[in-house]
Amino acid sequence: MLLNGPIWILLDSSAFGGIESHVLELAKGLTSHDQLVTVMFLSSYKPEPPLMAQLRDANIKIEVLDQTYTNSSFWLRLKQAITEAKVRPVVIHAHGYKANILLRITRLLAVTDKIKLVCSFHAGETPTGRVRWYDALDRFSAFLTEQRICVSRKIQSKLPCSSQLINNFVPEASLVESTGNNIAFVGRLSEEKGPDVFVSIANQMPETPFHIFGSGKMEPELTKIKSNNVTFHGHQTDMASIWPDIDILLITSRYEGLPMAALEAMSRGIPIISFALGELPSLIDSGRNGWIVDSRQQMIECLRHWRALTHSEKMHIKIQAQQTIEQNYSTQVVIPQMLAMYQR
């Protein structure tokens, strides 16, 4: 059932990561289901966040609050956007701690009557420094929104109030046949993502090419310890042209919810070898569509096992991986669930 009014998606974005990838697919998915969508950015950044260009390419309306409402303070801009809107939104869906907190403050200002307020929790790790306090405020004020969405049971367990578990999702994609034996890491080069684990595995398999797609504060350290078979490709804003060159994806994180990179890979039939993190054991049926392992050594053993398989054996696993996404983690499956949740 369609919603009778606009949906606003609210976030703060300066780079492109898991939240941005999710918001892009959410906006595109809702639009494909004939919903009116505006993605509201809290603040402007230089250079412009990559998500903005991708939304424009998809003909999705965007608005930047600090550009439109220049005379309001940060905490009052969403209130002004609501009160001045020609057509008020029926749903505002926030992503990330800044957007979540702003949405709840706006509710306390008594301007959200008849608007369904929804917040999503994406992060599986516990942040450090000042962000740790914002994260705590985000979680303990979550009751001020009508619906709360988590992408993993572990994230759910950190909330002091009830929430809905809704899978991350990606559009269906064509099966790719890799042109080589390339092993990939896709993500931010930070402690929680475990790129150092990826490099240590690569160092033990010098005959196999390993590729890192991403950037972050650990890059200088990683370049010092890597072997010659590891190539750094830097931050990527669009992996579509990259996936056909990837044979298998390793997820070496220390914390995860349900990473978008895993879904994007499997939607193309690229199997994953991962530690048992977040919802990945629900996504991966070990030995059928990928592998869940307990240690670095098991990850190496799985890689060698994969390389020893025949072409037909590999294709069977690739097809199973792709079908898992189509049946449980695709836009066509999850967007109707999201729309139903908006209307509860």
Language model segments and positions:
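Carbohydrate-associated surface elements
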Residues: 154, 169
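Aromatic "clamp/platform" in nucleotide-sugar-dependent glycosyltransferases that forms part
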Residues: 235, 254
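N-terminal strand-loop element at the rim of the active site
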Residues: 8-74, 216-218
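A short, well-ordered alpha-helix in the C-terminal region of glycosyltransferases
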Residues: 313-328, 334-339
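A conserved mid-protein helix/loop that constitutes part of the nucleotide-sugar donor-binding site
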Residues: 17-28, 185-204, 212-220, 263
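Conserved acidic donor-binding segment of nucleotide-sugar-dependent glycosyltransferases
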Residues: 286-297, 305-311
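Short His-centered aromatic/hydrophobic patch
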Residues: 94-102, 121
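Short hydrophobic beta-strand element within catalytic cores of glycosyltransferases
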Residues: 41, 271-274, 284
